[in-house]
Design a protein with these regions (language model features):
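Short, intrinsically disordered/low-complexity patches at protein termini
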Residues: 94-95, 105-106, 285, 385, ...
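Hydrophobic alpha-helix feature that most strongly marks membrane-spanning transmembrane helices
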Residues: 463, 488, 541, 565, ...
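Extracellular glycan-associated modules
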Residues: 575-783
Length: 783
């Protein structure tokens, strides 16, 4: 009850007067629009057509034509931090999201939990009569909360959303996603062979959610937070969509930048004098070193296009084609939502906001990858091996990412990419369309704004004041400002004065058209922060940050540096953390349970996430499955952990017991029984005995399989050093509900065991082994 009871209560109801107002469902302000909040992932400034890009996005064009294109809107440079701003209207460090939620370090600025004093826009609107829906990527809860034993307080349904369908982590396989429906994991409705793709699936659910409520209360507005996995790696696209771009990127990434900058100038997106930043603005790793000689990160480098052999160019062209297909395909799915809103008479009264969470990603490094799990496991990508996948790139057979050259291209004209406080990391697409509320159509806006400014804009447009208390928590002030003033005033001066940036030790500050920025890579011992070299740019006229004016205006630079410290203190930006990923990974964190020697798993349960599943890396292990085989026989998956990009499985096929260990997707190690599995009760086992390590962290040994106590097969195998998956692909009993560990399973998805699995017991021996370097690579690729 949010309002006091104003009726009369006496002994007899006949002498009492009711008051229903405190007990009524909340009602939205009269005429409040629907809100469709679309968040692209890792889509740089120069990928989509409304921003001069060469990737076809007709739905984005449609929204730009019916609304406004903002050229000077900014993010934090990373996923969870930006999404926290988009949800609360507060800075990322105020939200406890200085980095991705998995990299929490136990301080107010970096703990992986948005405080309840910083309510989400969904929490605010639910209490004001909106239906609230979340589709797609969340990435706003700590890793130890992404499981069925955890509290759901930081899941979407715990932070104001009435319905949720998507995934909780940083990325997912688009063909076999880690699906959660409301508060429980579910399996996808069909297989890729039957036409499944995550972008289409969440669109189907989005339409279902809208129709469910509108059929009952058509006047009740909705707030929908729609966050596809596109275009974060893996870049998974239906082949026919990727093939639309055959030959379109043959010019290479450097020529792409030139073509797109010319288009951007023609479209009035950037000043006519905007220069194109160098392809390696920080220099090569050999050229750029710390004060004591440490080289700059080797992954943060672009190979000049004209130095590449033709075969390498061929691979990189196809990687761009697949990425473009992924983007266009998802744009098409978003178009289905826009079409429905128009057909049902709702589009004019829907505020549509489209953003990306950061710049294009350079995490593919100079060479890109066909299987990112290779990088996470320290296995070098081979051009010869990658070329074998050229024709199936983007299919379920690959887990791919383009090279960093395309990240620079899709961030044109800016320098660097995601994670950097240069504009390549933080200046990102923003479209706003609201036909009933914005008179201007198809115009460009250049006012400087930030992700924190969208929540106050939504509140302004819906006629709702920021609440002082939400769910009993007194609220911290919203830190952003409304952008509504700019809707019909193209020349209005920005009402934002200052914005601070901090990400993994790299810092920036913008104030009244000027920006100071310093690069500080996350390398242990790179330098003391006092040794950082600050640069100065007049970004009002130099959008690409090509002209460093630090030497020309030293006093202005010092003022901005001082302002950075003031703003960082104001928004709890300390401590700064420039440690390596390995050091961040080893920070002690709360755990759901302590590691143990024995794990017991049951069928007909939710998939166990990789982070909570038994760790068998570089150690001996034994799995024993208690099963019941009917007289007619049985087949299917008994136990599966991981996927075709790394994992192991125990299954029955053609009456025989089989064990497969898939080494990072490179090769399968299969051991089959010499005898058939009998009917009745049996124990089916696979026991690995570690005999050595070669190379380090790669265990070598003997794997034996047993039916009851009889050894029925044996062979030597090697186990991979890192996790089975970068994200998702956990542990299942009685089926394999995600990407299959092997293509040898009998039957069809999800390859269920047709007998009965009572339980599977996994015993592990020896010390828990974690290859910190590999774990760190995997963590950073998830951001």
């Amino acid at each position: 009850m949010t309002k006091p009871f104003k009726g009369v209560v006496n002994l007899d109801i006949r002498d009492s007067t009711p008051d229903w107002e405190p007990y009524e469902q909340p009602k939205a302000p009269e005429g409040a629009p629907n809100v469709l909040y679309i968040v692209w992932d890792d889509v740089g400034f120069a990928a989509m057509e409304p921003f001069g890009g060469l990737i076809e996005t007709p739905t984005m064009n449609r929204l730009a034509e019916s609304g406004l294109t903002y050229t000077n809107w900014h993010t934090t440079a990373l996923c969870s931090p930006t999404r926290s701003c988009l949800m609360t209207g507060r800075n990322h460090t105020s939200n406890g999201m200085a980095c991705i939620s998995e990299a929490a370090i136990g301080f107010p600025n970096a703990n992986g939990h948005i405080p309840f004093e910083n309510a989400t826009i969904a929490e605010m609107l639910t209490e004001r009569g909106f239906n609230t829906y979340m589709l797609g990527k969340w990435h706003l809860c700590a890793e130890d909360e992404m499981n069925m034993a955890s509290s759901k307080r930081n899941w979407p349904i715990g932070r104001g959303f009435e319905r949720f369908y998507g995934f909780l982590g940083a990325e997912t396989n688009q063909w076999y996603p880690d699906l959660v429906h409301d508060n429980h994991p579910v399996e996808q409705p069909k297989s890729p062979e039957e036409g499944y793709h995550f972008s289409a699936d969440i669109t189907d659910k989005a339409l279902e959610f809208i129709r469910d409520a509108k059929a009952i209360a058509p006047e009740r507005p909705f707030f929908m937070y729609f966050c596809p996995g596109a275009a974060h790696a893996p870049h998974h696209a239906p082949k026919e969509w990727a093939d639309k771009y055959k030959g379109k990127f043959d010019m290479g990434y450097e020529r792409y930048r030139e073509l797109v900058l010319a288009r951007q100038k023609q479209m009035g997106l950037v000043p006519e004098n905007t220069a194109l930043s160098p392809i390696n603005p920080i220099g090569t790793p050999a050229e750029t070193k710390s004060p004591d000689g440490k080289p700059f990160p080797a992954l943060d480098y672009v190979k000049p296009w004209d130095t590449l052999p033709e075969e390498e160019k061929q691979l990189y062209r196809r990687m761009a084609e697949v990425y473009a297909g992924f983007l266009s395909y998802t744009d098409h799915q978003i178009g289905r939502i826009i079409d429905f809103l128009e057909q049902s008479g709702q589009l004019d009264k829907t505020l549509v906001i489209v953003v990306s969470d950061n710049g294009a990603s350079g995490e593919g490094g100079p060479t890109g990858s066909v299987n990112e799990n290779n990088i996470a496991n320290g296995i070098p990508d081979s051009l010869e091996e990658n070329l074998k996948y050229l024709e199936v790139l983007g299919s379920p057979l690959t887990y791919n990412h383009y090279p960093s050259g395309w990240a620079m291209a899709f961030n044109t004209p800016f320098k660097m990419w995601k994670r950097y406080s240069y504009n390549g990391g933080i200046c990102d697409p923003l479209l706003i369309s609201w036909p009933a509320g914005i008179k201007s159509r198809g115009q460009v806006r250049h006012q400087y704004h930030h992700a924190t400014d969208l929540v106050p804009t939504i509140l302004d447009c819906t006629g709702i004041e920021a609440p002082e208390v939400v769910k009993g928590y007194t609220q911290h002030p919203i830190e952003g400002v409304s952008m509504r003033y700019s809707f019909d005033e193209a020349q209005a001066r920005t009402n934002k004065q200052t914005q601070y940036y901090e990400m993994l030790g790299t810092r920036g500050i913008w104030h009244q058209g000027w920006k100071a920025v310093t690069t500080h890579p996350a390398i242990s011992g790179w330098s003391n922060y006092s040794q950082d070299t600050w640069e100065l740019y007049h970004t009002e006229v130099d959008r690409s940050e090509s002209h460093n004016l630090a030497a020309q205006y030293p006093d202005r630079l010092q003022e901005l540096i001082g302002l950075w410290f003031f703003e960082a203190g104001k928004y709890q930006g300390f401590p700064l953390d420039d440690r390596s990923a390995i050091e961040i990974l080893t920070t002690p964190r709360p755990q759901m349970t302590k590691p143990r020697d024995r794990y017991v798993y049951y069928p007909n349960t939710a998939e166990i996430p990789e982070s909570q599943a038994v760790n068998i890396r570089n150690r001996s292990y034994a799995m024993r499955a208690e099963v019941e085989i009917p007289a007619s026989g049985a087949e299917g998956v008994v136990f599966a952990h991981g996927s075709r990009f790394g994992g192991h499985a125990l299954y029955v096929k053609d009456g025989k017991l089989h064990y497969v260990y898939n080494f990072v997707g490179s090769f399968e190690q299969k051991i089959s029984s010499t005898k058939s599995v009998p009917t009745g009760a049996s124990t089916l086992s696979a026991i690995f005995t570690k005999e050595g390590e070669n190379p380090p962290h790669v265990a070598n040994g003997t794997l034996a399989i047993y039916i009851n106590n009889e050894k029925v097969g044996e062979g030597t195998i090697r186990t991979q050093p890192g996790k089975f998956s970068i994200a998702g692909e956990g542990l299942n009993v009685g089926r394999d509900g995600g990407e299959p560990v092997t293509g040898d399973y009998p039957g069809e998805y999800p390859w269920p065991f047709t007998g009965t699995v009572k339980r599977v017991v996994v015993d592990v021996s020896g010390e828990v082994n974690i290859n910190l370097e590999r774990e760190a690579h995997g963590m950073l690729m998830r951001d």
